[in-house]
Amino acid sequence: MDVFLMIRRHKTTIFTDAKESSTVFELKRIVEGILKRPPDEQRLYKDDQLLDDGKTLGECGFTSQTARPQAPATVGLAFRADDTFEALCIEPFSSPPELPDVMKPQDSGSSANEQAVQ
């Protein structure tokens, strides 16, 4: 089965899918293809827990029930900086601006734009 993932680092977000049977290392290869950083310079995390390269995504807890297209699972990403890895840092998403008044729903029972269907 496919799992749907949101790989996040600082303000970067990658949406991808993979098989439950794919290994963490194979997921790092996907990241390498996008961000041009080799797997040995990457660390992937689930809930602040470092993921083992040899484990499958299913063994790490990513299943088709927990990582769905409409609600992808979050994977943290950290890169190697010189001899050590940077701390895991994921910036929160920004809040959208408030809707303009013309786009807010009207409280009236019927709208002037509604027409009777005959």
From Swiss-Prot:
Compartments, record wording: Nucleus
Pfam family, one: ubiquitin
Ranges of compositional bias, category Polar residues: 107-118
Residue ranges, annotated region (Disordered): 92-118
GO biological process, one term: transcription elongation by RNA polymerase II
Residues covered by the Ubiquitin-like domain: 1-66
SMART domains: UBQ
Major localization class: nucleus
UniProt entry keywords in alphabetical sequence: Acetylation, Host-virus interaction, Nucleus, Phosphoprotein, Transcription, Transcription regulation, Ubl conjugation pathway
Superkingdom to which the source organism belongs: Eukaryota
Pathway: Protein modification; protein ubiquitination
One GO molecular-function entry: transcription corepressor binding
Claim: Repeat is one of the keywords in the record: no
Chain positions with Phosphoserine modification: 108, 111
GO CC entries: Cul2-RING ubiquitin ligase complex; Cul5-RING ubiquitin ligase complex; cytosol; elongin complex; nucleoplasm; VCB complex
Gene3D superfamilies cross-referenced by the UniProt entry: Phosphatidylinositol 3-kinase Catalytic Subunit, Chain A, domain 1 (3.10.20.90)
Annotated positions of the Phosphothreonine modification: 84
Keyword Nucleus set for record: yes
InterPro entries assigned: ELOB (IPR039049), Ubiquitin-like_dom (IPR000626), Ubiquitin-like_domsf (IPR029071)
In-chain residues carrying the UniProt-annotated modification N-acetylmethionine: 1
UniProt family annotation: Belongs to the Elongin B family.
Function, as annotated: SIII, also known as elongin, is a general transcription elongation factor that increases the RNA polymerase II transcription elongation past template-encoded arresting sites. Subunit A is transcriptionally active and its transcription activity is strongly enhanced by binding to the dimeric complex of the SIII regulatory subunits B and C (elongin BC complex). Core component of multiple cullin-2 and cullin-5-RING E3 ubiquitin-protein ligase complexes (ECS complexes), which mediate the ubiquitination of target proteins. By binding to BC-box motifs it seems to link target recruitment subunits, like VHL and members of the SOCS box family, to Cullin/RBX1 modules that activate E2 ubiquitination enzymes. Component the von Hippel-Lindau ubiquitination complex CBC(VHL).
Quaternary context: Heterotrimer of an A (ELOA, ELOA2 or ELOA3P), ELOB and ELOC subunit. The elongin BC complex interacts with EPOP; leading to recruit the elongin BC complex to Polycomb group (PcG) target genes, thereby restricting excessive activity of the PRC2/EED-EZH2 complex. (Microbial infection) Following infection by HIV-1 virus, component of a cullin-5-RING E3 ubiquitin-protein ligase complex (ECS complex) hijacked by the HIV-1 Vif protein.
Protein name per its UniProtKB record: Elongin-B
Recorded name of the encoding gene: ELOB
